[in-house]
Curated annotation (Swiss-Prot):
Residues 1-22 form the signal peptide. Disulfide bonds join 52-66, 56-77, 71-82. GO terms for molecular function: toxin activity. Residues 23-48 form a propeptide. The lineage of its organism: Eukaryota, Metazoa, Ecdysozoa, Arthropoda, Chelicerata. Belongs to the neurotoxin 12 (Hwtx-2) family. 02 (Hwtx-2) subfamily. It is found in: Secreted. One of its GO terms (cellular component) is host cell postsynaptic membrane. Expressed by the venom gland. This is U4-theraphotoxin-Hhn1o.
Length: 85
């Protein structure tokens, strides 16, 4: 029961993060159509922060702690947030 609740909450959080990222990409594409300078687009990238999610395997081996999911694709984890590098 507890694992199911955690899985549902994790999926909901991932869905919200992906929706937010899609909206930002759409906004960036509209900004590029208007002819926004690259320096302003870089500022938009710097403001993008996503919470680092904690990934736990359902079947743990012994008493090992859950490990934080690593940020990928030009992002690094800092203060429990994924920050654009």
């Amino acid at each position: 029961m507890k694992v199911t609740l955690i899985a549902i909450l994790t999926c909901a959080a991932v869905l919200v993060l992906h929706t937010t990222a899609a909206e930002e990409l759409e906004a960036e594409s509209q900004l590029m159509e208007v002819g926004m300078p690259d320096t302003e687009l870089a500022a938009v990238d710097e403001e993008r922060h996503f919470e680092c999610s904690v990934s736990c395997e359902i079947e743990k081996e012994g008493n090992k702690d859950c490990k934080k999911k690593k940020c990928k694709g030009g992002w690094k984890c800092k203060f429990n947030m994924c920050v654009k590098v």
